[in-house]
Amino acid sequence: MLNVKKAVLMLSAAMLLQGCAQQAVVEVADIVYPPAPNEPRFYYQETIMHSGQIEIESEDRMLQRILVGQNRTVFGLGKPFDLAVKNGRIYMSDSTGQKVLILDRVAGKVIEIRDAGFDQISAPFAVKVSDAGDIYVVDGTLKKVLVFDENGDFIKSIGSSDMFDKPTGLAVTADGSKVYVADTGGVSSQRHHVRVFNGHTGEHLYDLGSRGKEPGQFNLPKNIVLTPDGLLAVNDSGNFRIQIIDPITGDEVRTMGSIGMSFGQFARPKGIAVDVDGNIYVADAQLGNTQIFNKEGQLLMHIGQRGDNNRPGNFLLPAGIALDEDGRLYMIDQFFAKIDVFRPASVGKYEGSFALPRPKQK
């Protein structure tokens, strides 16, 4: 009798949800970049704004909630700063929430990371993930790099408060053997450089760059990323350029960008990423977009536009960006507290890390 009653209630709930879903379906035209009549290179895929878009609610929990008339409990992204993406997982730092979120769309769950040994995460900035799945987080208040395993359990820290003024950017070799930390410094600081550490022992190895505007020097270096050919791309934000340098000698190999509001220029460069072909992606908080350059520094295209309403592809305060294994671009906006996802035209909507179906929760 109880099983029959449960089945009836579940059927009623399913019909109710199906009706709501049918009412919510709205057909929208594809948002493409670059726009017609150009050949599409990227398609807007989705916007992530809260945990309910990731977490899979169990059938029992859904039934219980409907029976008592409760709304589903979800939480927003806070003030996202940076992110990394690997194997269907989004690792995102929430600078005001003092935590790192693992948005696991494959498992359908969200993990919060707050504890860091004897410390608590305070001001998480850049996030990176090694091939082994270890999570690296720069904390601007603790002034160290925090390392966690794939489950979010604390492993160790790298660096100390006396070694940095304002650590912001982070790059990690695939095997975790070297960790690069961009120290943004400040107006009165001379620490405008990249500090390099042994990723296994935590030993400080050497520094790259100094304060200035000459090749190989930096003014407010922020986000950094390693390129497929083993070079280091540095967002030299105060000099309004991206410098590609040798990660051992610090010598400049090439540079791209200049100050300005036109395409190919930078006004407030923020997040930086690189794809498998060596193309450099740079988000700009003033321009409200991500510009894509080839490895020679030539502008290829841009994705997104500045807009004061939260529509797909509109950004008012873009920050961190990342690429997944399929070439999808994940772009944070701090003002709208969202992540917009764009897929390459060569990748289907539900291919790779977006493959369906996701597992059901019992």
Please describe what each predicted stretch is:
Residues M1-V8:
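Bacterial N-terminal signal peptides that target proteins for export
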Residues V8-L9, N198:
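Sequence-pattern detector for short linear motifs
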Residues C20-K362:
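Eukaryotic scaffold repeat domains enriched in small/polar residues
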Residues M10-Q18:
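Bacterial N-terminal signal peptides
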